[in-house]
Amino acid sequence: MADKSYQPTLAGLRAFAAVAEKQHFGSAASALGVNQSTLSQALAGLESGLGVRLIERSTRRVFLTPEGRQLLPHARAVLEAVDAFTAAAAGASDPLQGSLRLGLIPTMAPYVLPTVLAGLAERLPALTLRVVEDQTERLLAALREGALDAALIALPAETSGLSAVPIYDEDFVLALPPGHPLSGKRRVP
């Protein structure tokens, strides 16, 4: 009979999932980077704590019991959740790792991308950059919906509800030939 307060260990769940996938103790142990004895102990502890046999062993074969087949998707879901939690924690401590979805307006892309991409893989090997080129309004909508992490846009733009950080200010001038009607004006209407 299982102890109702039993909490499976991650080692036990990983051992169970690996043996189920590999259907071989040696291969499962190798995949987890442990020896066979450690793997067997972790699996035995899980089975004992749950009060059910998960794996049947024969001289030639390893296979799941009906209970093992029923519980395997739950074990995998727990392991995926723990792995996602760990990855999120790593990403939270280092915002320059993981995935960055960057939006750019088409007029900026040819100027910004070569500078941004040059040496990026060497400087930030844990960062995966995905670039989306679109118009300002659609980029802002994608930011608000969570489809982008950041966007380089031109102002003025409606950025309420977002953080907007100016990165540079560039003056543009209109060059005209001598005698043009707009020549000598301080502002272009």
Swiss-Prot record:
- What's this protein's name? Probable hydrogen peroxide-inducible genes activator
Source organism: Mycobacterium xenopi
Q: Which residues bind DNA?
A: 25-44
Task: Name the Gene3D superfamilies for this protein.
Answer: Periplasmic binding protein-like II, Winged helix-like DNA-binding domain superfamily/Winged helix DNA-binding domain
Q: List the disulfide bonds.
A: none
Q: Which family does it belong to?
A: Belongs to the LysR transcriptional regulatory family.
A single GO molecular function term of this UniProt record? DNA binding
**Function of this protein?**
Required for the induction the katG gene for catalase. Involved in the response to hydrogen peroxide.
InterPro entries to which the protein is assigned, alphabetical: LysR_subst-bd (IPR005119), Tscrpt_reg_HTH_LysR (IPR000847), WH-like_DNA-bd_sf (IPR036388), WH_DNA-bd_sf (IPR036390)
PANTHER family attached to this UniProt entry: HYDROGEN PEROXIDE-INDUCIBLE GENES ACTIVATOR, TRANSCRIPTIONAL DUAL REGULATOR HCAR-RELATED
Instruction: List cellular component terms (GO).
Output: protein-DNA complex
What keywords is this UniProt entry annotated with?
A: Activator, DNA-binding, Transcription, Transcription regulation
Lineage, highest ranks first:
Bacteria, Bacillati, Actinomycetota, Actinomycetes, Mycobacteriales
Question: Which Pfam families does the entry link to?
Answer: HTH_1, LysR_substrate
The domain of life is Bacteria
For the keyword Transcription, the answer is yes
Ranges for domain HTH lysR-type come to 8-65
